[in-house]
Regions:
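Small-residue-enriched alpha-helical segments and adjacent helix-cap loops
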Residues: 62-63, 86-178
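Iron-sulfur (Fe-S) cluster-binding modules
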Residues: 1-89, 105
Length: 178
C-alpha cells in the first residue's frame, strides 16, 4: 500500500508548502528555546494549533489527580501550556463544503493522530483533539494535499459565517442575510 506522501505530496501548492515548512521550523526553534512562549503561542494559534491547558501534566481519574510524565519535561508551547500536553487542531472548511477525497483524509487523520473523533464546529469547521504539537506539520501537509488548510482557523480572523441555506426565500425569516 502506498504511503500518503507518494499519493498526495505533489498536490500541495507551493504557498501552503512554504507556510507549513516555516511553521515546522518555528516548532524546532521553540524546542531549542530560541522563540518566546507568547510569540510562539500567537504563531501556532494563527495556524489553528491550540494548547489545551486542562491537561498540563495532570489528569483527574475520577478519584484523584494523577501526574502524567511528559518526555519533554518543562518545555512549554505557550504560556502555562506544556509541550507534550495534548492539543487541538482546528481545520478551516470554507463554505462548509467538502469533497469525498477530503472527507477520507479528514477521517484517516482522526484515526491516526486524534481520538478517532472529528469534531464539527458551529462555524462549519472541524477540530481534532489530543494532537501532539510535533504531529501538526505532517497533518497540515496531508490536509494541504487535498486543498484544506488550518491557516487562520482561529484567533481574531474572519471565519465561516453561518446562515440559513434558504435565506432570502424563507417565509418566516426575521431579515434577509443573503
Amino acid at each position: 500500500m502506498k504511503e500518503w506522501k507518494e499519493i498526495l505530496e505533489n498536490k500541495i501548492t507551493a504557498e501552503l508548502r512554504e507556510q507549513i515548512d516555516i511553521f515546522e521550523t518555528q516548532i524546532e526553534l521553540k524546542r531549542m528555546g530560541k522563540v518566546d512562549d507568547q510569540l510562539f503561542a500567537e504563531t501556532r494559534l494563527r495556524k489553528g494549533v491550540y494548547g489545551q491547558r486542562y491537561d498540563n501534566g495532570q489528569r483527574h481519574d475520577g478519584n484523584e489527580v494523577q501526574e502524567l510524565n511528559f518526555p519533554s519535561g518543562e518545555l512549554l508551547k505557550g504560556p502555562e501550556t506544556v509541550w507534550d500536553a495534548p492539543g487541538m487542531l482546528r481545520i478551516k472548511i470554507p463554505f462548509g463544503s467538502l469533497k469525498p477525497e477530503q472527507m477520507r483524509v479528514l477521517a484517516d487523520l482522526s484515526e491516526e493522530y486524534a481520538d478517532g473523533v472529528l469534531h464539527i464546529t458551529t462555524r462549519q469547521d472541524f477540530q481534532y483533539h489530543y494532537i501532539h504539537i510535533d504531529d501538526n506539520p505532517t497533518i497540515m501537509r496531508r490536509l494541504a494535499a487535498v486543498g484544506i488548510t488550518t491557516h487562520e482557523a482561529c484567533g481574531n480572523v474572519i471565519r465561516n459565517v453561518t446562515a440559513c441555506p434558504i435565506a432570502g426565500v424563507c417565509h418566516d425569516e426575521n431579515f434577509d442575510v443573503s
